[in-house]
Design a protein with these regions (language model features):
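Low-complexity, glycine/proline-biased repetitive segments and flexible coils/loops
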Residues: 1-203
Length: 203
């Protein structure tokens, strides 16, 4: 049987009118989570990324939700996937991510993967050359202009349905033992798809 995939770490958020003052700030960079096997093995949610001032308003990018096995996936920056015929995929947090992918296949425990990390999902700019301002691992991410770090969507398990991702995220995940290949994010457009679900021995 397949357990759920882990969620991605919390990513980049946008804010307007935030006042930064001279004081101590605690900055946490969240970590991506691991998958978990077993019939009811819900994966782990991704860690939040945050900036927390000693006094004032915190900024928290919520980690991606875990994928579910026979259980439902958990809501996060992007929602987790869930197994086909048992539970639907979890929704993403409003303003922080997209829904996870649904599971699929011929068995009820082929789970969906975890959701991608939080990001500026669905954000657009008025700049006609805005494509060059997405962080994609090449020099466009260091040029002057508006930079948008888009979060990925959750992937589907086996023959499941992939979710809509954050400006290049999303994609169909494969189950650990084979099945459909995953779809990665598109260059110059942001995050990739959610990670794949796990498979335990004998499944």
């Amino acid at each position: 049987v397949n357990g759920g995939g882990g969620g991605g770490a919390g990513g980049f958020l946008t804010a307007s009118g935030y006042s930064a003052t001279i004081q101590s700030y605690t900055i946490t960079v969240g970590a991506g989570a691991i998958a978990r096997g077993g019939t009811s093995g819900v994966g782990n949610s991704g860690g939040n990324s945050s900036i927390v001032p000693a006094s004032g308003t915190s900024i928290i990018a919520i980690g991606g939700g875990a994928g579910g096995g026979a259980s439902a996936g958990t809501t996060g920056g992007s929602g987790g996937g869930a197994s086909y015929g048992t539970h639907s995929a979890a929704a993403g947090t409003v303003g922080q991510g997209n829904a996870g992918g649904a599971g699929g296949g011929n068995q009820p425990y082929w789970a969906g993967a975890g959701g991608g990390g939080a990001g500026a999902v669905g954000t657009t700019t008025s700049t006609t050359d805005s494509t060059n301002y997405y962080r994609d691992g090449n020099t466009s991410g260091t040029t002057a202009g508006i930079h948008i770090f888009a979060g990925g969507g959750g992937a589907g398990g086996d023959s499941g349905i992939e979710s809509v991702g954050g400006l290049g995220g999303g994609g169909r995940g494969s189950r650990g033992g084979g099945g459909q290949s995953f779809t990665s994010g598109t260059a110059n457009t942001g995050g990739g798809g959610g990670g794949n679900g796990a498979v335990t021995a004998g499944s």
